[in-house]
């Protein structure tokens, strides 16, 4: 993860680091703990714009203060019809689409990330896996510098 953080700082547009107090307050507010990847990322930078600055930034890793349930970010309604309460929008990818963190599951101690397509949310058929961890997602974005739908290619 450290080489990814170095690259974000060197080649992209990181925000100032989150303080330990901000991280603690965030975890208290949402009721889940950051996994090891996120615990490394947020003290390094409390969000970042990847590839280019806004407007037009293809990947905006959200600051802790902007992370909300995916159903609120995508549909504007905190209701179960719009997906599980355990899904959180962590990265804005333009046009109302997000990359979503599934805090209801862990793989090797890390939360998987899924596609939070505005058009299809919360249909799991169309909103499939993006990465098994935040570090895998970040590495794919930094390596390919391509949009969400081509990360696996």
Report residues per predicted region.
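Broad, structure-driven detector of short, well-ordered beta-strand segments within folded domains
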Residues: 97-105
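A short alpha->loop->secondary-structure connector
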Residues: 106-110
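Residues in well-ordered beta-strands of folded domains
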Residues: 91, 102, 114
């Amino acid at each position: 993860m450290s080489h990814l953080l170095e690259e974000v700082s060197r080649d992209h547009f990181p925000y100032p680091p989150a303080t330990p107090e901000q991280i603690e307050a965030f975890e208290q507010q949402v009721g889940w703990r950051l996994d090891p990847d996120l615990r490394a990322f947020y003290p390094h930078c409390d969000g970042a714009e990847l590839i280019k600055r806004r407007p037009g930034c293809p990947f905006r890793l959200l600051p802790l203060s902007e992370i909300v349930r995916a159903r609120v970010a995508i549909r504007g309604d905190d209701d179960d019809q719009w997906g599980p309460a355990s899904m959180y929008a962590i990265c804005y990818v333009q046009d109302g689409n997000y990359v979503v963190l599934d805090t209801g599951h862990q793989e090797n101690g890390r939360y998987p990330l899924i596609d939070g397509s505005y058009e299809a949310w919360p249909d799991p058929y169309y909103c499939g896996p993006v990465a098994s961890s935040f570090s895998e997602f970040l590495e794919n974005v930094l390596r390919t510098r391509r949009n969400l739908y081509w990360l696996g290619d």
